[in-house]
Each structure stands twice: as structure tokens, then as C-alpha cells.
């Protein structure tokens, strides 16, 4: 399910971020998420099977929007797009990665942890940013403070969001 813009990513309340050790586990996981009402998934590039897992979900569970995360190098952008990613997610944005994400044919959620990073990424045309690591960077209080002067930017908080604090993030 290819996205031409990131709008669906800001309308879902939760994007599960998963690290899949074995590609064989990908399809059952995706089907379980879909059955539970979650149609977006971010697969991290933290295992050798990550891209194969993404390819399997894209081929077998077409109703899931598949993002590839932990994109940290321009080469990761190429591999993720070649695998069929619907969107890309990075934990941070070194200068070498910003342009690669901006040039990608799919939406990207580049990572930020400061107001300056958020403003820089917005200037590059990114309307949705990954706020990472959310909890240790100020969490809900940071988001409330930043959204006021920067209402045009949407944030996807990740890192430290769990069952104890998720409701406060979803309420934003």
C-alpha cells in the first residue's frame, strides 16, 4: 500500500515499532496486528532479516502500511525503498541522511530531539517527524511546548513510550 503523502501516518493513534529476528515471524505478526485493528507497522533495520520480513509482509498482507525504521545511512534509504517500504523512519538526521530522505519516493519521518532539529527538518519539507527518544527528551511536556510555536509540524513520539504512559501521548 504505497503512500504518496504521510497523512495516514498522522491519523493512526499508534504505530507499532517491531524488531523481527526471523522473516518467518513477519506474516503472522502482521496478520495479528491487522486483526487487532492496527494497519501500520514500522520494522526496524536491527536484524539481518528485517528487509526480508518487510518484503514478506508487503507481498502477503497488502492491507498493512509497512514502514522501515532505523534508517541511518543513505544506503539504508535505497535498500528500504527497493524492499517496497511505504514510508521510512530515522532515529536522527545527520546532514548526509536529510537529503536522501527528502529525495526518497516515499514519505519519511526523520528523527528529532530538539526544536532546532524540528525546524531544520520542517524547512526541508518534512511535515511529520519522529520525536526520539521521546520520554528521555521531555516526553509529553516537550511536545505540548513545541507544538504551540510550531503547529505545522506533527510528531510521532517513539522511545520510552509504553503501557504506563501511552495514553498521555495518544491524548495529544
Mark where each language-model region is:
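Conserved anion-binding
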Residues: 49, 72-171
Amino acid at each position: 500500500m504505497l503512500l504518496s503523502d504521510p497523512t495516514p501516518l498522522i491519523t493512526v493513534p499508534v504505530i507499532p515499532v517491531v524488531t523481527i529476528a526471523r522473516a518467518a515471524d513477519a506474516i503472522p505478526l502482521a496478520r495479528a496486528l491487522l486483526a487487532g485493528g492496527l494497519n501500520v507497522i514500522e520494522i526496524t533495520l536491527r536484524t539481518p532479516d528485517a528487509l526480508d520480513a518487510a518484503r514478506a509482509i508487503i507481498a502477503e498482507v497488502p492491507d498493512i502500511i509497512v514502514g522501515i525504521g532505523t534508517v541511518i545511512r543513505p544506503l539504508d534509504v535505497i535498500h528500504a525503498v527497493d524492499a517496497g517500504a511505504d514510508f521510512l523512519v530515522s532515529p536522527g538526521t545527520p546532514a548526509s541522511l536529510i537529503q536522501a530522505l527528502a529525495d526518497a519516493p516515499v514519505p519519511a519521518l526523520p528523527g528529532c530531539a530538539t526544536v532546532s532539529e524540528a525546524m531544520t527538518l520542517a524547512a526541508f519539507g518534512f511535515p511529520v517527524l519522529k520525536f526520539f527518544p521521546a520520554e528521555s527528551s521531555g516526553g509529553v511536556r516537550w511536545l505540548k511546548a513545541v507544538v504551540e510555536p510550531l503547529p505545522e509540524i506533527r510528531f510521532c513520539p517513539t522511545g520510552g513510550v509504553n503501557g504506563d504512559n501511552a495514553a498521555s501521548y495518544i491524548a495529544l
